[in-house]
From Swiss-Prot:
<comment type="function">
    <text>GTPase that plays an essential role in the late steps of ribosome biogenesis.</text>
</comment>
<feature type="binding site">
    <location>
        <begin position="207"/>
        <end position="214"/>
    </location>
    <ligand>
        <name>GTP 2</name>
    </ligand>
</feature>
<dbReference type="InterPro" id="IPR005225">
    <property type="entry name" value="Small_GTP-bd"/>
</dbReference>
<keyword id="KW-0547">Nucleotide-binding</keyword>
<dbReference type="GO" id="GO:0042254">
    <property type="term" value="P:ribosome biogenesis"/>
</dbReference>
<comment type="subunit">
    <text>Associates with the 50S ribosomal subunit.</text>
</comment>
<feature type="domain" description="KH-like">
    <location>
        <begin position="373"/>
        <end position="457"/>
    </location>
</feature>
<feature type="binding site">
    <location>
        <begin position="117"/>
        <end position="120"/>
    </location>
    <ligand>
        <name>GTP 1</name>
    </ligand>
</feature>
<dbReference type="GO" id="GO:0043022">
    <property type="term" value="F:ribosome binding"/>
</dbReference>
<dbReference type="InterPro" id="IPR016484">
    <property type="entry name" value="GTPase_Der"/>
</dbReference>
<feature type="binding site">
    <location>
        <begin position="254"/>
        <end position="258"/>
    </location>
    <ligand>
        <name>GTP 2</name>
    </ligand>
</feature>
<dbReference type="Pfam" id="PF14714">
    <property type="entry name" value="KH_dom-like"/>
</dbReference>
<dbReference type="InterPro" id="IPR031166">
    <property type="entry name" value="G_ENGA"/>
</dbReference>
<feature type="domain" description="EngA-type G 2">
    <location>
        <begin position="201"/>
        <end position="372"/>
    </location>
</feature>
<keyword id="KW-0690">Ribosome biogenesis</keyword>
<protein>
    <recommendedName>
        <fullName>GTPase Der</fullName>
    </recommendedName>
</protein>
<dbReference type="InterPro" id="IPR006073">
    <property type="entry name" value="GTP-bd"/>
</dbReference>
């Protein structure tokens, strides 16, 4: 028979969970620390299968005598169990001795769950992600007193133990709450992973004068909507045109071409101002480069607007039919000149003959998908903890710098907050490392990733605005 051991410090709710899983009051529960001194055992059912549940005494690392014996028995029970539920009090902050014991137990038993109890609502659950620093593969939030998350815990246990539920299940009244909770959890996960489809994707077309922006717009639309001329600077006002790509409405803004500062006069100053205002509202920028000519410093400065407005980006290599170099050579120069756009995909096109225009349309949708990507909180925290385990944060003059947990508080672009003990000590190079680590795990091609650091209990201004708080 499979064995499940509940272990943890006194008064974290072990006996209450034992009673909840056993569906009867067997273990005595009390607010007095250390009420449970003997190991309690009870055969229970999980997914229609019998398992042995073991309620250990509360562990105090420094206790001797009676409580030292309790600790010894509890640790032995944990080593012998098939699954260990290490419980902590979610109302308290993570304790170093808990972390040390948890990691020691993990060396003895690979099926070790970290169960954070007393998480009574979603706000407390967000704070509960501080416990991600334990490095647990299975991190579960429950409230035994509110019967919150207990059903999900049972399903995780069944999954690890390979317990298969009977094909026909008749739900009792008690089980209906678990089922409802499970369905709600599925809905919440769906909400985290899938953002509501945008009413329209706003795409700004930017580049120097006469690189073919208006020709590109006409090629995308399939008709001549924007005036095309060999005279540099024909487009003065941004031109808005919309179309549908695979059922998704896309609004294109053909912006005015940008000249070197010394040559900007009168009405073109107005045009530059209008262009920047258009980009403020854009989601994605198509940075158009003329491949029939050498790239210039001005191309780099225009590319800087993408970084300034944190836009999704595609580098469009136009006039590819009359290019003077091969792709590898062009790609090498683009990556060298536009280091801040290393995440941008490159698409070769010819606005004149329609080459790769359909490919560009598909890439616009893909980049927007990445630009609006939301990582489920549990997966995000596991990824951040893996990153910090592989490459620990540098200390700050001998003081430990630690990431407690992470939350993604915004999309378009993805915005992630790292909750830390010393946020001011997060070096830009480590921030870049975290961004690159996320790019290795998830598809963020064409999208910037914004990383912020803050203390516990604080919210940054953009985080407050994203959450709609006062």
């Amino acid at each position: 028979m499979k064995t499940i051991a509940i272990i943890g410090k006194p008064n974290v709710g072990k006996s209450s969970l034992f009673n909840r899983l056993a569906k009867e009051r067997i273990a005595i529960t009390s607010d007095v620390s250390g009420t449970t001194r003997d190991i309690k055992k009870q055969v229970i059912e999980i997914e229609g299968n019998e398992v042995l549940l073991v309620d250990t005494g509360g562990i105090e690392l420094k206790e001797t005598g009676l409580f030292g014996k309790v600790r010894e028995l509890a640790l032995r029970a944990a080593k012998e169990a098939d699954v260990v539920l290490y419980m902590v009090d979610g109302k308290m902050r993570p304790q170093d001795d808990d972390i040390s014991l948890f990691r020691a137990l993990h060396r003895e038993n690979e099926h070790l769950f970290l169960v954070v109890n007393k998480i009574d609502n979603d706000k407390e659950k967000e704070r509960g992600w501080e416990f991600a620093e334990f490095g647990a593969e299975k991190l579960l939030f429950i409230s035994v007193s509110h019967n919150r998350g207990v059903g999900a815990l049972q399903r995780e246990i069944a999954d690890v133990l390979g317990l298969e539920a009977p094909q026909e299940i008749v739900l009792s009244e008690d089980d209906e709450e678990d089922l409802e909770e499970y369905l709600v959890s599925l809905e919440e996960e769906e909400i985290e992973e899938i953002e509501e489809a945008p009413s329209e994707i706003r795409v700004g077309i930017i580049g120097k004068v006469n690189v073919g922006k208006s020709s590109l717009l006409n090629a995308l639309l399939g008709s001549e909507r924007s005036v095309v001329s060999d005279v540099a600077g024909t487009t003065i006002d941004p031109v808005d045109e919309s179309m549908e790509i695979e059922g998704q409405k896309v609004l294109f803004v053909d912006t005015a071409g940008i000249r070197r500062r010394g040559k900007i006069e009168g009405i073109e100053k107005y045009a530059l101002d209008r262009t920047q205002k258009a980009l403020e509202k854009a989601d994605i920028a198509l940075l158009v480069l003329d491949c029939s000519l050498p790239f210039a410093d001005l191309d780099e400065k225009i590319g800087g607007l993408v970084d300034k407005f944190s836009l999704g980006v595609i580098v469009v290599l136009n006039k590819w039919d009359i290019r003077s170099r091969e792709f590898k050579e062009v790609e090498k120069e683009v990556r060298h000149r536009f280091k801040y756009l290393e995440h941008a995909p490159l698409v070769t096109v010819s606005a004149q003959n329609g080459r790769h225009i359909d490919m560009l349309k598909e890439k616009i949708l893909k980049v927007y998908e990445n630009f609006s990507r939301r990582i489920p909180t549990s997966i995000l925290n596991k990824t951040i903890m893996e990153a910090s385990a592989r490459h620990p944060l540098p200390s700050d003059h001998g003081k430990i710098v630690r990431i407690y947990y992470a939350t993604q508080y915004g999309v378009c672009p993805p915005q992630i907050s790292l909750v830390m003990n010393r946020p001011n000590s997060l070096h830009f190079s480590y921030k870049r490392y975290v961004v690159n680590f996320l790019r290795d795990r998830f598809d963020f091609e064409g999208s910037p990733i914004l990383i912020r650091a803050r203390k516990r209990g604080e919210k940054l201004q953009d985080e407050i605005e994203a959450l709609g708080e006062d």
